[in-house]
A protein has these predicted regions:
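C-terminal amphipathic helix plus adjacent low-complexity
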Residues: 314-333
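A donor-sugar binding/catalytic signature common to diverse glycosyltransferases
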Residues: 88-99, 109-110, 252-289
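Donor nucleotide-activated moiety binding/catalytic core segment of transferases
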Residues: 72-79, 226-262, 266
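Catalytic binding pocket for nucleotide-activated donors in carbohydrate/polymer assembly enzymes
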Residues: 272-316
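Conserved nucleotide-sugar phosphate-binding/catalytic loop shared by glycosyltransferases and other
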Residues: 24-68
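A nucleotide-sugar donor-handling region in carbohydrate enzymes
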Residues: 128-200
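Catalytic donor nucleotide-activated moiety binding site of glycosyltransferases and closely related
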Residues: 47-60, 208-243
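A conserved, positively charged/aromatic
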Residues: 108-110, 117-132, 253
């Protein structure tokens, strides 16, 4: 089978890495497109995935997103036409599902946050199948035109599938000036450029200021953009480390005592790896986060002083799942 995969954000590289490997092992031909956004290209190179770069992120404004979407879809259509794809796969890329539909290619999209309304109104309606975690109530997807048999659901977190074969490498942290006696906290900045996260996260700067002045803490901050990196460095907080280059984030999480994240992927990676994690997300919580909070695997944070800054003992209950199940659900034919 000839399959097209479109990757539009760094996390999508991690999701599709084991799936692409499984497809190639069974003899399928895979071609990948990607857009330039954050560390997407770096991660593709790190994992040895060749991709055709088409388009870039549209920035904060809706007008910018609309313009880059039109340009990118034109580029995708021009690239894909005549390649005779039998299936197209994406993680939330409405660019792919819309383009695939216009070319008559069956497509599947997957996501784990149901309130990215505009994105899902476009992407879900164009897709042949929509694959989501069981934690998302099906009725929340009906407004996007998603019902069985179009709807396919999987147990657990997507991170439990793509991290199934992951073993953390302590050597990945050698470039960081870490003191093993201090509490290691991994901190992820808010997704301020995301369309569904329109308001700034007021809690996050308070958390950063609190951690950055704790003498028994080392907070490794992983910014999403150069602008965020410059902002954090300018604060000159004594207990904050901002890596000069991209780091193995999954290994960093695995060896951390605590994770504090304003996004979603890193929260769920920590939960999958059994690491205590707090969310400072300022938007509406989705079904996955709601389930993790009920299970005690994710803690909502409203006051930085509530952080339990202690050394961790043990793996906290890591969960692994077979990525072949995810692949079976995604394949639209």
């Amino acid at each position: 089978m000839k399959i097209w995969v479109d990757i539009t954000a760094p996390a999508h590289v991690l999701v599709f890495r084991p799936l692409i490997q499984l497809l190639r092992e069974r003899g399928d031909e895979i071609e990948v497109t990607a857009r330039e956004y954050a560390q997407t290209v770096q991660l593709l190179e790190l994992h040895g995935i060749e991709a055709e770069l088409i388009g870039r992120h549209g920035g904060r404004s809706r007008l910018g997103k609309l313009g880059t979407m039109a340009t990118r879809m034109t580029g995708l259509r021009r690239w894909a036409r005549g390649r005779h794809f039998e299936a197209a796969l994406a993680h939330g890329s409405h660019h792919l599902t819309l383009t695939a539909r216009s070319l008559g290619i069956p497509s599947s999209t997957t996501f784990d946050y149901e309130f990215a309304t505009l994105q899902h109104q476009l992407g879900c309606r164009a897709a042949t199948f929509v694959v989501v975690p069981e934690a998302i109530p099906p009725e929340r997807l009906e407004r996007y035109g998603v019902r069985p048999p179009k709807l396919r659901r999987y147990p657990g977190l997507k991170e439990e599938y793509y991290l199934a074969d992951f073993e953390p490498a302590r050597s990945a942290l050698d470039a960081l000036p870490l003191d093993p006696e201090r509490v290691l906290v991994t901190v992820r900045t808010p997704p301020d450029v995301s369309l569904y996260h329109r308001k700034s996260n007021r809690l996050f700067p308070q958390v950063l200021n609190h951690l950055g002045r704790e003498e028994n803490v080392q907070a490794v901050v992983l910014p999403r953009t150069d602008e965020q990196r410059d902002f954090v460095r300018a604060l000159e907080l004594p207990s904050v480390i901002v890596p000069e280059q991209a780091v193995d984030a999954q290994s960093l999480i695995a060896f951390s005592d605590l994770v504090v994240s304003a996004g979603g992927t890193m929260n769920r990676e920590a939960a999958a790896l059994g690491v205590p994690v707090y969310t400072t997300y300022g938007g509406r919580l989705g079904g996955v986060d709601e389930a993790l909070i009920r299970e005690g695997r994710l803690r909502p944070l409203t006051d930085p002083r509530a952080l339990e800054l202690v050394k961790r003992d043990g793996d906290g209950g890591r969960v692994r799942r077979d990525p072949s199940l995810m692949l079976e659900l995604l394949l639209p034919v």
